[in-house]
């Protein structure tokens, strides 16, 4: 492989910026740029050491940056290649000049995610662990971070490998029974034994799939839409949850003319919180566009926060909103409890049909804790805190597990219908192959390229 280089820290002003190199020529290329005290070179440095010095243009001798350089030699590195990390002062100009020097001296600009891709290709991590790196970077809550860390440390991989080993052992027994039925010292693979083996694998796959809903919520966040008539307090609710002003809050109906989105962490539940323009008919063309977008977002939501005005009677528009969210996960919020109550609370509970109803005065910052508790109780059962739980959150993994379960079901149905054992073997082999796709065994190169292209440069 050639040697790659990239800036591994976010662009912009900061205390430190890092230029990373990986590959067989990493140390040699860095040495061409490095000027150490008393003529010290990086080539003579031991692995996993850090060295003070300067980066200089090898053609002009001009000093570009004062640096600390880490030397990490293969195979005890993230990529299992020689790795150099040049710690520069944070900024844009100097760190870019250091990168350009590395490219001029023989390195190639890394593609997005190429460092992690090399870690995968060199056997340092498997595909599910590589995907967990991105999950860790994108984690919005402590629980999401813990999920990613467990996967990155190989908990899911270990379970998948164990299931594959069990399937492979079963397949080997089937093969021996087919090819050498006369051998007395080989355990006979009866239909009953085959059912036991296949059912055991199915049970574990189903257990993983039961964790997928909460896992996906932690990974991607709940698409949460705030709806209500104009001026009932939707934008105030958004700002209360986000703890900063994101939307215009006035007494004028219709001041939110578009969809406003923000990530918030509500007691460990990540919400992609969306404030919508009031869903009503309007003559204002700009506001009408916002209303149309609101309706589309509503259809795609995981959770609805339906806001009502506690100081006004229920209107026909309010009732229509209840009808629009029929069958969806909804929390009803009666806002403006600081004003005289005019709403029919019993009628609201009737329309809510058993779904949570909370009261708030967002102006006085009252009732937010009750709302957060309602959100937590809807989507968090406590299972995520279990340190022993292994589960899936990645959409690709979930899809593969569903296919693997179907393959096991097909095998069990075949056994029940007394089909030839070699036909059952095909379905079990299919399940074994599918599970291998989770950890990166026998996956197409285009899929690998597509997965790593989602990473940032330098990772």
Swiss-Prot record:
Give the record's keywords alphabetically: Cytoplasm, GTP-binding, Hydrolase, Magnesium, Metal-binding, Nucleotide-binding, Potassium, tRNA processing
Identify the PROSITE patterns for this entry.
Answer: G_TRME (PS51709)
Sites where the protein binds Mg(2+) = 235, 256
The record ties this protein, via Gene3D superfamilies, to: P-loop containing nucleotide triphosphate hydrolases, Probable tRNA modification gtpase trme, domain 1, tRNA modification GTPase MnmE domain 2
Q: Which GO terms describe its cellular component?
A: cytosol
* Cofactor names: K(+)
Cellular compartment(s): Cytoplasm
**Chain positions recorded as K(+) binding sites:** 231, 250, 252, 255
Which residues does the annotation say bind (6S)-5-formyl-5,6,7,8-tetrahydrofolate? 20, 85, 124, 459
What's the EC number here? 3.6.-.-
Which stretches make up the TrmE-type G domain?
221-380
Set out the biological process GO terms recorded for this chain's protein.
Answer: tRNA methylation; tRNA wobble uridine modification
Binding-site residues for GTP, renumbered to this chain = 231-236, 250-256, 275-278
Domain of life according to the entry: Bacteria
Cite a single GO MF annotation. Answer: metal ion binding
Recorded hits in Pfam families, A to Z, give: MMR_HSR1, MnmE_helical, TrmE_N
State how the cofactor is bound.
Answer: Binds 1 potassium ion per subunit.
- List the InterPro entries: G_TrmE, GTP-bd, GTP-bd_TrmE_N, GTPase_MnmE, MnmE_dom2, MnmE_helical, P-loop_NTPase, Small_GTP-bd
Family membership noted in the UniProt record: Belongs to the TRAFAC class TrmE-Era-EngA-EngB-Septin-like GTPase superfamily. TrmE GTPase family.
Q: How does it assemble?
A: Homodimer. Heterotetramer of two MnmE and two MnmG subunits.
Describe the function of this protein: Exhibits a very high intrinsic GTPase hydrolysis rate. Involved in the addition of a carboxymethylaminomethyl (cmnm) group at the wobble position (U34) of certain tRNAs, forming tRNA-cmnm(5)s(2)U34.
**Name this protein carries in UniProt:** tRNA modification GTPase MnmE
Species in which this protein is naturally found: Bacillus velezensis (strain DSM 23117 / BGSC 10A6 / LMG 26770 / FZB42) (Bacillus amyloliquefaciens subsp. plantarum)
User: What is the taxonomic lineage of the source species?
Assistant: Bacteria, Bacillati, Bacillota, Bacilli, Bacillales
């Amino acid at each position: 492989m050639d040697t790659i280089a990239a800036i591994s820290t976010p662009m912009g002003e900061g205390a430190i910026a890092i230029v990373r190199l990986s590959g067989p020529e990493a140390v040699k290329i860095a040495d061409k740029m490095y000027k150490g005290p008393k003529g010290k070179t990086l080539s003579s440095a031991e692995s996993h050491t850090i060295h003070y010095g300067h980066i200089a243009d090898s053609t002009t001798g001009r000093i570009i940056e004062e640096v600390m350089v880490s030397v990490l030699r293969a195979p005890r590195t993230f990529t299992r290649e020689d790795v150099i990390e040049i710690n520069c002062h944070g900024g844009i100009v100097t760190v870019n000049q250091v990168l350009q020097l590395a490219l001029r001296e023989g390195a190639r600009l890394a593609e997005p995610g190429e460092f992690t891709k090399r870690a995968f290709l060199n056997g340092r991590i498997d595909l599910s662990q590589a995907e967990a790196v991105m999950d860790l970077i994108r984690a919005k809550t402590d629980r999401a971070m813990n999920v990613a860390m467990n996967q990155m440390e190989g908990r899911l991989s270990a379970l998948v490998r164990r299931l594959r080993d069990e399937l492979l052992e079963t397949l080997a027994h089937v093969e021996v029974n087919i090819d050498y039925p006369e051998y007395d010292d080989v355990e006979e693979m009866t239909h009953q034994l085959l059912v036991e083996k296949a059912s055991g694998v199915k049970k574990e796959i189903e257990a993983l799939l039961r964790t997928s809903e909460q896992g996906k919520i932690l990974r991607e966040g709940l698409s949460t839409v705030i709806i209500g008539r104009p001026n009932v307090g939707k934008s105030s609710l958004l700002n209360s949850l986000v703890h900063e002003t994101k939307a215009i809050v006035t007494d004028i109906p219709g001041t939110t003319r578009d969809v406003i989105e923000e990530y918030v962490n509500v007691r460990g539940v990540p919400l992609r919180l969306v404030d919508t323009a009031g869903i009503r008919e309007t003559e204002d063309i700009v506001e009408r566009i916002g209303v149309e977008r609101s309706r589309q977002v509503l259809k795609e939501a995981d959770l609805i926060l339906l806001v009502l005005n506690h100081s006004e009677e229920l209107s026909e528009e309010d009732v229509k909103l209840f009808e629009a969210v029929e069958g969806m996960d909804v929390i009803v919020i009666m806002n403006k409890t600081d004003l005289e109550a005019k709403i029919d609370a019993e009628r609201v509970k009737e329309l809510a049909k058993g779904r949570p109803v909370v009261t708030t005065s967002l102006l006085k910052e009252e009732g937010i804790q009750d709302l957060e508790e309602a959100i937590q109780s809807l989507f968090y059962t406590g299972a995520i805190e279990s340190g022993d739980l292994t589960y899936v959150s990645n959409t690709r993994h979930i899809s593969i597990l569903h296919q693997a379960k179907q393959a096991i079901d097909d095998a069990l149905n075949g056994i029940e219908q007394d089909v030839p054992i070699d036909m059952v073997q095909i379905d079990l082999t299919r399940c074994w192959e599918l599970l291998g796709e989770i950890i990166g065994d026998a996956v197409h190169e285009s899929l690998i390229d597509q997965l790593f292209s989602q990473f940032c440069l330098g990772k």
